UniProtKB/Swiss-Prot annotation:
Signal peptide: 1-20
Listed GO biological process terms: ERAD pathway
Similarity comment: Belongs to the LCL2 family.
InterPro entries xref list: LCL2
Keywords attached to this entry: Signal
Keyword Signal included in the entry's annotation: yes
Ranges where the record places region Disordered: 33-59
UniProt-recorded name of the protein: Long chronological lifespan protein 2
Organism: Podospora anserina (strain S / ATCC MYA-4624 / DSM 980 / FGSC 10383)
Cystine residue pairs: none
Gene: LCL2
Role played: Probable component of the endoplasmic reticulum-associated degradation (ERAD) pathway.
Amino acid sequence: MRSLSLILLALATMLTPISAQFGFFDQMFGGGGGGEQEQHHGHGHGGHQRQQQNAPSDGAGYRAQYARLHCDNYLCPDTLACVHFPHHCPCPWPAHEEKVELAEGQRICVSHGGFKAGEAARKVELARKGLL
């Protein structure tokens, strides 16, 4: 009886569609679902597999979100954060990137690349001085 239960559980697990939602587009574009379409494909067992349509290859959704936002100061183009100065913009992926402020009032985001904190900024500074 136990082996039958395990077989049924394994079969149900294999037939169940799994979809990973990382929330990036919901977070980035407000999650309105505009233009998001699902396609259903039937299988021999009567099941349905959901496939989301790829994001459009143009930046129309991004531009629409950008236009809807209000910011009295500076609206960061990559994170859509409202800050006082461009070099205050946060990195889009702070868990994986280190923000480095440049002398010209700009900032760049550099991948940690497995280095300890501050090491990426040190390497950028060495490169700017021509030492790397």
